[in-house]
Amino acid sequence: VATVDCSDYPKPACTMEYMPLCGSDNKTYGNKCNFCNAVVDSNGTLTLSHFGKC
């Protein structure tokens, strides 16, 4: 199972770097920061499906 450490999130701003991750909601997140902010917003219900685009 792929995991991402989101312990240092949420962050107020994310960089524009593109390193896509696919969430358990079948949505592609542009990078770890965007994904981790969404994980925090979801109260931990969002998980990583896999690295790369969905």
From Swiss-Prot:
Disulfide bonding pattern of the chain: C6-C36, C14-C33, C22-C54
Entry GO CC: extracellular region
Location in or out of the cell: Secreted
Keyword terms, alphabetized: Disulfide bond, Glycoprotein, Protease inhibitor, Repeat, Secreted, Serine protease inhibitor
Site (Reactive bond 3): M16, E17
Molecular functions (GO terms): serine-type endopeptidase inhibitor activity
Start and end residues of each Kazal-like domain: 4-54
Protein origin, superkingdom: Eukaryota
Residues annotated as glycosylated: N43
Residues that span the membrane, as ranges: none
PROSITE patterns xrefs: KAZAL_1, KAZAL_2
InterPro entries attached to this UniProt entry: Bifunctional_prot_inhibitor, Kazal_dom, Kazal_dom_sf, Prot_inh_Kazal-m
Domain notes: Avian ovomucoid consists of three homologous, tandem Kazal family inhibitory domains.
Full protein name: Ovomucoid
The species this protein was found in: Cygnus atratus (Black swan)
